[in-house]
């Protein structure tokens, strides 16, 4: 894609050719769209303008969304905003053109000019844009005044005594910030004069006032520089440089700004604005011109001479007439005045757009420090104007007044050329269009536009629209403003991570090179000498230049973290405010600590007032209980946010620790170049679909013993094709093999326990929604409720999710006593199917034991009672009647009870889409009982009841059978220990492990077939001896784009511009290129040209209207009519060559580093003399034949085998040890599932080994393979669902049978050990898998906290399975080299995956963001972002080539000691894994956000039943707890009091809790549920009800019984509970 010639470039691969072809096609389509859309181009005759637009235009539907998504920030009615939001529309085209005067008698030419800057300056009445202040509750200490005071303190910084002189200080980056104005908005006098002179007559009509309009300033880069310079140089002649040391006055260009002669009126057609409801929506524009804009100075009477062929055209004649209206004159009265606010804001915007991260050594001297600072700022701005904007170098000016190295000047020219000439094709989607794809939306169709990154605003809008469409009840419950706010801040976590991480390149205010540092430290070696020195030392022939964040005394003089952040934002107070609001949004309701502790400021812990922040001049954290107006300072907010991002508890220890690491990131300047290894943390954007390389790079497998490798040995030579096929199959690329496995075997889940989210059936979707909507909050569920896969290269990997509900129903729908399937009618009428199919799992040859349900009712009931009281025999064969039915439809008690249980299952888990609520379903049940004249307690009372005569014998029998069996099964679900094979948890775990076993077997069979082995057994033999992986490391390369135009986030823009600056600096350093007078676009690498011809689309001016303004527009129709004539007349339309976004490569090493305790080994000619003993051991193992025929267990960590294999004192397993183990243990994958894999004799041994391993699962200091962690998490999730259902059933039947039956705590270990005793093979499979995962898996203990669990589990299963079955490791083939001696580490080699998750996944809470499929509507699914540490590396081209290439390289310390490291929840030891985390733009993202300070509907809040939501709302809303307390008291008939406590009489706290739970939280009406309600909600309420709220009593044990629904009095309810308990005991006795 580079334009420079490469004489020895390698031949392009087929993939590269395809990509280049796709890119060329995309460029052609982009140019075609621009050519066919005249509104995208137009004459931009001015350099800036001041616009007045009615406030009504900003009251559109998506006002909140655009205000946040485009990062509008206002203080005191003034600030900055995105041009995309503020532009009137087509008046400011994205591809502006300007007429250029030609020689006398010739027509002017049309050429491209700079567009307006992407940020505008809001001057007045911008309060209507400040949506965050309306929605995000801020304490006074975080208000606009506090931010203003913080900025004033930054302006007052001065160099310390002895640290630097004023001259040196001003030469440093940021030294000029102390001269920024303290003004928060323009002077009232300035705005009053401006409005009276240019706008008042136009806007004040038809009842309109000045207060009804927003005033803002728009300017192109050169005009913005002039605005900034004029404020700093107010006392200096703007036309000249002042006399310096040599007393020479050097003339400069006219840098003045002049207002035009007219105020124009333009139509507002920006689709983001509320133009539809505003009649005749217009904006009033006063243009201004830069002094160098000579064409519009009014010197020409006609721009087209009469002799020109086009003069006779009406189109041109009209423009000749309008020309004078467009001009300006250099009169004194037309000079544009500039106030301090405009100048300072313009300076910050310019410095953000063109960062100067290096020292500028001034040569002028003066005694006036204030004047010197002004000149220093002026020089920096002039440097930007001349080099970055105009791309010209004036040695006679620059060299005489200040010194900048030639390398830096070239880098600035390089960066400026990219900034001004790069065009983002996808930026069209957000310019003067609505949130939808808009005017160039067709560009996103298909795959053609996947070459470049899409805009974040389009991604956010698409996500929000999809949430509205597919979000269901959650979307309906969210009000529009909350929804828009959530999506507008969709990337808040990555943004804050960049700002608060002081190792981020965003915070690199000064960068230096290794060569510069060497010069500063007195190293006189030249670059050439340094290269030669490194070459002699055996290093790279090319000197590896690096970029480092250098010491900056200005930055380090700041102690407050808030000031440091403000400093790195170039003093932009409005941008700082928006970041602080992002932090408040991220924390939401968790700003204050739950225990209300007052924390001490880490910097002032030893002071007299440790809670007072001397930086922010307020309390550090005033979060005490009882303090009504809680507040905190900026330091606390920043540290509290860092705790949230790093998943740390906000304790005093953690906050102090973070302070020590971040408040003073670099106290001392560097003193040596030997440790010049600083890596920047960057947040770069990539496109996943464009990156063809997988995480496994170019690693290949080979079989050294087979002549043709993996080719089919039976392949016959036909037409010379044998050689080609043999060559292709000689080696197999690991990437292709893993992809094939992920496609053929996408998941290890059992078919009865999984749901395919890509091809979800109606029934599976029903189960999925039940589980997601009912249990996600109440269980703290960690499952991924995501519709659609996110696997790489469109494999189905990641699309299969575990379904607990489906798993449990599968167990209940199987009948171990029947050998045939049958259907059973449901007992209770609820939504869904009316019958259930019961699958008979009994072996057909055991048919004698089948039971008939037609025996004597008395005997059946007696048998059932025995089972209920745990005295029955397993299998339920006690009944005396064992008759058979010919049709096989067994009507035994087991089947009836299962049907009843299925009914109860749906009762306890109501469908969110069902027509009946939980209460309504319960009412339906009671209605059924009444219709049948059955008393609900009749089952227990009928021996003595008169109502027995009302029932038929059949009805009585069925009711008894169903109810008693349900009681038994419920008890089995919640009993403490797995006592029998009928235990539901045991069945679920057994089914899960059976799925794992079958997966490994299918995987082995697939690999054997794929690699052309005749059998799994044959493949196993070669795996033990000859299958190896070639390549010492596995690399992955990703493509990334630096495309600031495609993001509206100022932080992301600044970051990408600094990356580009560092890239340019590194390139010139490494290439040692001389500075060119004019930057040649061919020197810009990895950019393609986009030729866009200039179109003759001229302005048109209408007649003066009643408001005194002329209508300004574009003569598009005239241009279309005369386009042919313009071409025939020879009009020059030379295309301007724009550049595609700068593409960079990111190289990632996905091999895990070696452990430090493994010594280096010498390999000479492929031999290993010092490990001959170890090789002899393995040779003996391979030759030894084991004939036991079954699986032999071993110690999981295999320490004894490690020592025997030559690994002394090592806990590390590697593939060589696994080869030893698999051979010794006689692992035969082909025997899995056939009954011959494992022996029951080894059960105790395996159980003991696994028990020891399971005991380590609770140890947080022990790292475990991610695959094993996820498998255990899955099993625990399913069994926890059993507990939850058991609790619901206990609540349903509690009054009758469960008053004394306690809920058990599930123990996965006990269940697994029980499974091993019954299924020895499954225990062996788990044992084997743990060892394989220890070797080939990733030791990242995320526990589903951040990563996409389904994807991580199944992708790891594929890698672990392939590695273990083929026993792949770096064999001798990888160690052979042309070098006589080669040093290599032969230790464990783990293939680490690309961990993919979604952007802004709730890293703080470990889940909770719902996502829906966007594959049908979103066009940017391939978008990704990377958070990681990068360093620049350089390498030469092929031999004979002079080309030098540069890449970004992912460093070994991925996420090391940075905030992203804590986000990833990896310890220091884990960082060596170099796990690459790909943060995908979420298809749908919404985090519930409750605005502070608004009225809360208490009834609506309580009806949601979300305890976490209620808790957070109480914490975030002042006075709400007391209001809810009054609400609760009124609901139980007690009058609340405004002051003091209510009269509670004899009602204890436990009784109060019971009543409140019964009335308002009936779904939590069981013991555990009550405790949960009390802990999360009532703890805030009891303090307003009872005086002593220090200790809250634990509520008494009780069961919920609804007397009103059963038509029973409350007094009878108490008696009934007692009778039920007594009669239940009686039944147990009778059962015996």
Curated annotation (Swiss-Prot):
Residues 1607-1632 have a biased composition (Acidic residues). Residues 1-63 are cytoplasmic. Residues 1-15 have a biased composition (Polar residues). Residues 1-23, 516-538, 838-890, 1603-1632 are annotated as: Disordered. Glycans are attached at residues 149, 274, 654, 719, 797, 1012, 1031, 1261, 1339, 1511, 1546. It comes from the Viruses. This is Uncharacterized protein ORF22. It comes from Ostreid herpesvirus 1 (isolate France).
């Amino acid at each position: 894609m580079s334009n420079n010639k490469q004489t020895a470039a390698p031949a392009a691969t087929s993939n590269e050719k395809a990509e280049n072809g796709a890119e060329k096609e995309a460029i052609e389509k982009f140019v075609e769209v621009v050519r066919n859309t005249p509104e995208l181009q137009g004459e931009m005759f001015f350099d800036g303008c001041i616009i007045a637009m009615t406030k009504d235009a900003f009251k559109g539907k998506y006002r909140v969304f655009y205000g946040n998504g485009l990062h509008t920030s206002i203080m005191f009615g003034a600030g900055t905003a995105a041009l995309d939001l503020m532009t009137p529309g087509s008046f400011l085209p994205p591809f502006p053109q300007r007429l250029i005067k030609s020689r006398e008698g010739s027509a002017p030419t049309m050429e491209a000019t700079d567009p307006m800057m992407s940020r505008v300056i809001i001057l007045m009445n911008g309060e209507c844009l400040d949506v965050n202040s309306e929605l995000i509750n801020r304490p006074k200490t975080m208000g606009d005044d506090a931010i203003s005071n913080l900025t004033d303190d930054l302006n007052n910084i001065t160099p310390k005594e002895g640290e630097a002189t004023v001259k040196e200080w001003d030469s440093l980056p940021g030294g000029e910030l102390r001269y920024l104005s303290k003004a928060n908005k323009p002077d009232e006098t300035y705005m009053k004069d401006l409005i009276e002179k240019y706008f008042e007559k136009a806007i004040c009509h038809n009842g309109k006032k000045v207060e009804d309009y927003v005033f803002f300033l728009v300017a192109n880069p050169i005009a913005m520089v002039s605005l900034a310079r004029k404020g700093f140089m107010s006392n200096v002649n703007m036309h000249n440089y002042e006399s310096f040391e040599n007393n020479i006055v050097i003339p400069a260009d006219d840098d003045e700004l002049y207002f035009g002669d007219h105020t124009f009126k333009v139509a507002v057609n920006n689709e983001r604005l509320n133009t539809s409801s505003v009649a005749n929506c217009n904006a009033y524009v006063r243009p201004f011109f830069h002094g160098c804009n000579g064409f519009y100075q009014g010197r020409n009477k006609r721009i087209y001479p009469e002799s020109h062929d086009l003069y006779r055209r009406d189109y041109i004649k009209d423009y000749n007439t309008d020309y004078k209206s467009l001009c300006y004159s250099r009169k004194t009265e037309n000079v544009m005045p500039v106030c301090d606010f405009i100048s300072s804001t313009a300076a910050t915007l310019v410095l953000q757009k063109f960062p100067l991260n290096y020292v500028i050594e001034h040569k002028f001297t003066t005694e006036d420090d204030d004047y010197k600072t002004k000149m220093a700022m002026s020089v920096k701005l002039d440097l930007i104007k001349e080099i970055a904007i105009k791309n010209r170098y004036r040695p006679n000016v620059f060299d005489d007044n200040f010194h900048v190295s030639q390398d830096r000047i070239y880098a600035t020219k390089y960066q400026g050329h990219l900034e001004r000439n790069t065009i983002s094709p996808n930026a069209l989607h957000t310019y003067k269009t609505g949130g939808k794809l808009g005017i160039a939306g067709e560009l996103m169709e298909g795959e053609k536009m996947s070459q470049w990154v899409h805009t974040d605003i389009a991604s956010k809008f698409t996500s929000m629209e999809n949430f509205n469409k597919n979000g269901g009840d959650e979307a309906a419950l969210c009000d529009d403003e909350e929804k828009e706010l959530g999506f507008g801040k969709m990337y808040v976590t990555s943004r804050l991570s960049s700002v608060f991480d002081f190792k981020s390149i965003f915070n690199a205010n000064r960068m230096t090179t290794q060569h510069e540092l060497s010069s500063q430290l007195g190293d006189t070696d030249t670059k050439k000498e340094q290269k030669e020195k490194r070459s002699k030392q055996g290093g790279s022939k090319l000197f590896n230049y690096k970029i480092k964040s250098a010491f900056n005394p200005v930055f380090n003089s700041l102690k407050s973290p808030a000031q440091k952040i403000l400093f790195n934002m170039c003093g932009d107070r409005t941008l700082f405010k928006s970041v602080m609001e992002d932090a408040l949004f991220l924390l939401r309701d968790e700003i204050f600590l739950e225990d209300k502790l007052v924390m001490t400021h880490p910097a002032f812990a030893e002071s007299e007032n440790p809670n007072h922040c001397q930086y922010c001049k307020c309390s550090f954290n005033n979060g005490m209980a009882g303090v009504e107006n809680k507040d905190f300072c900026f330091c606390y907010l920043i540290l509290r946010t860092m705790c949230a991002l790093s998943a740390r508890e906000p304790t005093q220890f953690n906050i102090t620790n973070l302070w020590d690491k971040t408040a003073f990131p670099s106290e001392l300047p560097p003193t040596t170049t030997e440790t010049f290894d600083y890596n920047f943390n960057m947040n770069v954007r990539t496109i996943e679909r464009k990156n063809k390389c997988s995480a496994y790079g170019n690693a290949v497998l080979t079989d050294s013993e087979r002549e043709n490798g993996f080719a089919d040995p039976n392949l016959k030579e036909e037409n010379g094709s044998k050689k080609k096929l043999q060559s292709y199959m000689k080696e197999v690329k690991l990437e292709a093999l893993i992809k094939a496995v992920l496609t053929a075997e996408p998941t290890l889940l059992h078919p009865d326990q999984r749901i395919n989210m890509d091809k979800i059936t109606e029934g599976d979707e029903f189960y999925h929604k039940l589980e997601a909507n009912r249990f996600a909050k109440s269980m703290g569920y960690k499952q991924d409720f995501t519709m659609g896969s996110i696997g790489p290269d469109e494999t189905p990997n990641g699309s299969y999710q575990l379904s607990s509900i489906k798993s449990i129903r599968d167990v209940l729908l199987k009948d171990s006593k029947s050998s045939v399937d049958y259907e059973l009618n449901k007992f209770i009428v609820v939504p869904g199917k009316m019958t259930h199919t019961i699958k008979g799992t009994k072996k057909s040859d055991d048919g004698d034991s089948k039971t008939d349900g037609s025996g004597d009712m008395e005997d059946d009931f007696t048998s059932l009672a025995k089972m209920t009281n745990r005295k029955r025999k397993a299998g339920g064969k006690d009944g005396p009647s064992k008759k058979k039915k010919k049709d096989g439809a067994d009507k035994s008690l087991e089947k009836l009870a299962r049907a009843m249980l299925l009914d109860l299952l749906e009762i306890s888990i109501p469908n969110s889409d069902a027509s009946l609520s939980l209460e309504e379903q319960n009412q339906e049940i009671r209605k059924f009982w009444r219709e049948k004249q059955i008393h609900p307690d009749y089952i227990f009372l009928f021996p003595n009841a008169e109502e027995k005569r009302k029932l038929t014998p059949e009805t009585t029998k069925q009711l008894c059978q169903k109810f008693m069996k349900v009681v038994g099964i419920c008890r089995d679900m919640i009993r403490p220990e797995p006592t029998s094979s009928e235990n539901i948890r045991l069945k679920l775990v057994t089914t899960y492990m059976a799925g794992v076993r079958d997966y490994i077997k299918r995987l082995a069979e697939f690999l054997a077939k794929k690699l052309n082995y005749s059998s799994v057994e044959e493949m196993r033999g070669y795996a033990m001896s000859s299958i190896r992986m070639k390549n010492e490391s596995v690399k992955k390369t990703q493509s990334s784009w630096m495309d600031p135009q495609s993001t509206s986030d100022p932080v992301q823009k600044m970051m990408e511009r600094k990356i580009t600056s560092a890239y340019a600096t590194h390139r010139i350093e490494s290439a040692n290129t001389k500075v060119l007078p004019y930057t040649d676009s061919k020197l810009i690498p990895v950019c393609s040209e986009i030729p866009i011809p200039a179109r003759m689309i001229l302005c048109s001016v209408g007649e003066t209207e009643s408001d005194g303004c002329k209508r300004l527009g574009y003569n598009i129709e005239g241009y279309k009519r005369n386009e042919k004539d313009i071409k025939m007349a020879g009009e020059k339309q030379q295309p301007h060559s724009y550049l595609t976004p700068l593409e960079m490569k990111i190289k990632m090493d996905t091999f895990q580093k070696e452990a430090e305790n493994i010594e280096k080994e010498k390999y000479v000619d492929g031999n290993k003399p010092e490990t001959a003993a170890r090789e002899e051991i393995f040779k003996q193992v391979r030759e030894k034949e084991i004939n036991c025929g079954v699986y032999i267990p071993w110690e999981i960590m295999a320490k004894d085998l490690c020592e025997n294999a030559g690994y002394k004192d090592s806990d590390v397993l590697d593939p060589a040890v696994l080869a030893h183990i698999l051979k010794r243990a006689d692992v035969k994958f082909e025997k899995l599932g056939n009954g011959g894999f494992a022996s029951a004799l080894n059960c105790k041994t395996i159980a003991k080994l696994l028990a020891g391993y399971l005991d380590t699962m609770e140890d947080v200091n022990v790292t475990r393979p991610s695959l094993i962690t996820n498998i255990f998490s899955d099993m625990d999730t399913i069994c926890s669902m059993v507990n939850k259902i058991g609790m619901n059933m206990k609540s349903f039947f509690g009054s009758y049978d469960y008053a004394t039956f306690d809920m058990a705590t599930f123990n996965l270990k006990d269940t697994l050990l029980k499974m091993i005793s019954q299924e020895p093979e499954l225990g062996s499979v788990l044992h084997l898998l743990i060892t394989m995962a220890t070797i080939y898996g990733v030791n990242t203990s995320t526990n589903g906290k951040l990563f996409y669990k389904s994807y991580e589990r199944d992708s790891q299963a594929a890698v672990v399975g392939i590695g273990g079955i083929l026993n792949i490791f770096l064999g001798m083939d990888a160690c052979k080299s042309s070098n006589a001696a080669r040093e290599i580490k032969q230790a464990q080699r783990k293939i680490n995956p690309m961990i993919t998750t979604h952007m802004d996944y709730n890293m703080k809470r470990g889940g909770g963001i719902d996502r829906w499929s966007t594959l049908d509507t979103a066009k940017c699914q391939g978008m990704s972002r990377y958070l990681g540490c990068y360093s620049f590396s350089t390498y030469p081209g092929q031999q004979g080539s002079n080309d030098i290439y540069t890449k970004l390289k992912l460093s070994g310390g991925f996420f090391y000691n940075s905030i992203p490291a804590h986000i990833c929840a990896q310890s220091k030891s884990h960082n060596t894994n170099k796990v690459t985390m790909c943060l995908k733009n979420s298809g749908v993202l919404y985090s519930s956000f409750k605005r502070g300070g608004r009225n809360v509907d208490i009834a609506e809040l309580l009806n949601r039943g979300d305890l976490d939501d209620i808790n957070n709302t109480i914490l975030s809303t002042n006075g709400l707890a007391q209001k809810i307390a009054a609400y609760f008291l009124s609901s139980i008939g007690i009058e609340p009091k405004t002051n003091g406590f209510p009269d509670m009489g004899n009602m204890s706290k436990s009784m109060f809790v019971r009543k409140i739970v019964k009335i308002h939280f009936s779904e939590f009406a069981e013991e555990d549920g009550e405790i949960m309600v009390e802990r999360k909600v009532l703890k805030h309420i009891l303090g307003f009800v009872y005086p002593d709220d220090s200790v809250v009593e634990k509520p008494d044990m009780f069961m919920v019984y609804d007397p009103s629904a059963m038509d029973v009095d409350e007094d009878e309810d108490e008696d009934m509970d007692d009778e039920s308990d007594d009669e239940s005991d009686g039944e147990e006795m009778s059962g015996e």
